[in-house]
Amino acid sequence: MKHDELAAVILAAGKGTRMKSEQPKVLHPIAGKPMVTFPVAGALKHGCQPTVLVVGHGAEAVQAELAEDPVSFALQSEQLGTGHALLCARQALQEFSGTLLLLCGDVPLLRDETLERLIAEHEKTRAAVTVLTAELSQPFGYGRILREGDEVLGIVEEKDASSEQKTIREINTGIYAFEAPFVFEALSGVGCDNAQREYYLTDVLAAARAAGRRVGAVVLEDADEAMGINDRVQLAQASALMRRRINENLMRAGVSFIDPEQTYIEPQVEIGPDSVIYPGVCLGGDTRIGSGCLIEAQVTIRDCQLADNVHVKPGSVLEGSRVGSDTAIGPMAHLRPGTVLAGHNKIGNFVETKKAHIGLGSKASHLTYIGDAELGANVNIGCGTITCNYDGVNKHKTVIEDDVFVGSDTQFVAPVHIGRNSLIGAGSTITKDVPPNALALSRSQQRVVADWRLRHDPKCKNKD
């Protein structure tokens, strides 16, 4: 939906004492991403320009985390309440006259659809203030919404509320839509005559009422969206809610989960329909998984692209790799960054690859290291094969062309080039290039000494 001019201020200055951490509270992760990135993404998705973050404790760390986002920052050097925090952003918004959203950096679960409802209601009613509210069975600690019928009269904080007001279940989420010029004018007249000696943003509602302006409200359909994070217990609770939301969205899109409560997927991960995800799987970063894939238990995949019909067996780790279709990986395989599998491959148990391009149909079934290597199509790598790529100073490349058969327990001392359709005998150490269609052997000739043990081992002398 097209909206009037939009801007956003995101409050991210709090120290988060109850987190008991040197790290700023808003940088603690939810589903693998710093929690502040969720409201930032929501504001930017709705076209909020400018988007201003009010920072304080750990300001440099927060700025560094968001350095690539089109946002600006305002410093709140002293924590004097939410009203004071918004005033700190005034200079960055002095030319702005549209709808101003106020979001919280420690409220990461707010859905885009909810933000859309808040904006639409605020613009439709032409209110000076529209507050996002929620109904809680246990509202202790939250500011209560004071109403007269459908009209919002104000908000009273927990420490300032009367006994009767504390029975109200509708609470302030701390998320607002304001008419920008009005809110800054109203804040200029706000004092700190309250129990906390802070500048309450909620006093703006009283100023709007006094000016005869409308104060509106939008009630959350799901109160969990307004969950603020103040300690590590709430961090874990919010993480579980986000995980459930991500997994349910994927299930509705055609992905099967054996146990969604034990599966950890970051929000930007994409999975195609008819894929099956087992418990203990962790998928993160820029990961895209195709259709019909099977990801078995205790697999970790980060920053990888998997084509259709890929089978990743238990205990495998994939990082920064591309995997072609109809490929089997694992169990207990490790694909390190720079691995590219063309498709129809087998990378078996205890195989490690790094900066390896492996051609169509090639396989390494077990106990192998392939690093800084280029393999052609239909190459068979025998058990125990190692590309010796590092000389203590530099890395070197191994090239193995199409249709090569490599026997077990082979070492390729790079740089080395193996021609197509050649055969490498088991137990060989290959230090020189091998031409196409050749047999290469480097092991010594077998020698048999008859009765050697009977002559040299006292334990065996009486067994003749």
Curated annotation (Swiss-Prot):
Enzyme class: transferase
Domain of life: Bacteria
Enzyme Commission designation: 2.7.7.23, 2.3.1.157
InterPro entries for this protein: Bifunctional_GlmU, GlmU-like, GlmU_C_LbH, Hexapep, MobA-like_NTP_Trfase, Nucleotide-diphossugar_trans, Trimer_LpxA-like_sf
Region of interest (N-acetyltransferase), ranges: 254-464
Pathway: Nucleotide-sugar biosynthesis; UDP-N-acetyl-alpha-D-glucosamine biosynthesis; N-acetyl-alpha-D-glucosamine 1-phosphate from alpha-D-glucosamine 6-phosphate (route II): step 2/2; Nucleotide-sugar biosynthesis; UDP-N-acetyl-alpha-D-glucosamine biosynthesis; UDP-N-acetyl-alpha-D-glucosamine from N-acetyl-alpha-D-glucosamine 1-phosphate: step 1/1; Bacterial outer membrane biogenesis; LPS lipid A biosynthesis
Alphabetic keyword roster: Acyltransferase, Cell shape, Cell wall biogenesis/degradation, Cytoplasm, Magnesium, Metal-binding, Multifunctional enzyme, Nucleotidyltransferase, Peptidoglycan synthesis, Repeat, Transferase
GO BP, sorted A to Z: cell morphogenesis; cell wall organization; lipid A biosynthetic process; peptidoglycan biosynthetic process; regulation of cell shape; UDP-N-acetylglucosamine biosynthetic process
Residues annotated to bind Mg(2+): D106, N230
SUPFAM superfamilies: Nucleotide-diphospho-sugar transferases (SSF53448), Trimeric LpxA-like enzymes (SSF51161)
Binding annotation for UDP-N-acetyl-alpha-D-glucosamine: 11-14, 25, 76, 81-82, 143, 157, 172, 230, 336, 354, 369, 380
Localization per Swiss-Prot or TrEMBL: Cytoplasm
Reaction equation(s) it catalyzes: alpha-D-glucosamine 1-phosphate + acetyl-CoA = N-acetyl-alpha-D-glucosamine 1-phosphate + CoA + H(+); N-acetyl-alpha-D-glucosamine 1-phosphate + UTP + H(+) = UDP-N-acetyl-alpha-D-glucosamine + diphosphate
Record-linked Pfam families: Hexapep, NTP_transf_3
Bound cofactor: record note: Binds 1 Mg(2+) ion per subunit.
Cellular compartments per GO CC: cytoplasm; membrane
Record's keyword annotation contains Acyltransferase: yes
Chain residues that bind acetyl-CoA: N389, Y390, S408, A426, R443
Region (Linker): 233-253
Chain positions covered by the region annotation Pyrophosphorylase: 1-232
Catalytic residues, chain numbering: H366 (proton acceptor)
Co-factor(s): Mg(2+)
Family to which this protein belongs: In the N-terminal section; belongs to the N-acetylglucosamine-1-phosphate uridyltransferase family.
Name of protein: Bifunctional protein GlmU
The gene coding this protein: glmU
